[in-house]
Amino acid sequence: MLRTTGIYFIILVMILVKCFLPDEKPEIIPFPLQSVSDKGDFTFNKATLISVENEKQAMIARELTDLFTLSAGFTPEIKIQDKRANIIFRTDRELAAEHYKLNIAPSCILIKASGQKGFFYAMQTLRFLLPPAINNQTQVENIQWNVPGMTILDGPRYSNRTVAIHTPFTLISKDNLKELIDHLAMLKINRLHFTQEVHDTTPEGQQKMKDMNLYAKSKKITISNGTTHTHDIISYLPFQAERLIWKANISDCDEDKKGYSNI
């Protein structure tokens, strides 16, 4: 009798602890302003249908569905104003610019925002909530493409969220730089600065360049990868714009000087 009572007591304590523990935080960077976990998961599959209000929203939704094409081997369909959809884009003018509300239930996902930026950032949050394999460039087998049930209300804490890249010392290829821009968009970065100053006229600057060349040689990396040319950097701008990462004014520099500043 005492043993049975002890077991019941342990079960009761476990239930109480579970009730009073805070909700597990979603693995989203940056962490949302508000998030409340709910029961159940929403599963993406071949039958998933996304309803949007216009073509601009469709372009944003396509950023996500293209990931499924590569990694999952299926592409969720996108239609305008389709009542059968289980993922719904809905404009809410009461939400501030760049803010969004995401309601995830087992049967549907409702995405609210006042404009393009909010819907785009909601897509980035969904990308975080999906299994990491969603970012694979080749198809992955035996994956349940689930996102946990929850309600998220989110928006930026800062209007300018900037990353600066010092191109003379950036030892990555142009393709890798585009991949970096894509990941910056996931983090909801909205400005990218390319700096062009090369401090090789001082002894310290010359030593730095020498060390960089030695390091690059040891890693079989070519420093003069072309990322510092004005025309190359300009070629990234449409790619950045699709991911809502903006620039400042291009300085009036000629290509021979590899000049590009104030971005």
Residue ranges of model-derived segments:
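Acidic, contiguous N-terminal accessory segments
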Residues: 2, 6-156, 249, 254, ...
